Amino acid sequence: MKFIHDRSSNILFSLHDSRVKEIKYHNETLTLQVNKIYEFVEGEKRSYPGEICFEKCDIDLCDVLIFNKTLGEGRFNGKSISLQQFMDEYTDSEFEIIIEGYYGNTTTYTGWLREEGKRPVTAIMYV
């Protein structure tokens, strides 16, 4: 199934709890491979594995903020890295989308970054 989101319509799918398994960038297309895309049809929740594609994406304008813990209370610190650096350094990690936001020409995913043997931390991806 191919779905093209036109950003002016209601959001038909949810990525909440989706886990990004792989990120690829080729020919100005950024592709996030996720384990599940959720859809509500007639009150029923359905899920499908799939890909989220951003065509004509300038990867130099994409960033990831990685924090030292899951955010919610207290002090925290973190770092900002380019999406390309994230793709290079976090190949064995998994990013679970908790909140998705669509703002004009920007998409924001906030969630948990999971690495083997470590506690999850909050990360924010700007596309």
Which residues are covered by each model-predicted region?
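Surface-exposed, interaction-prone regions used to assemble/regulate multi-protein complexes
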Residues: M1-V127
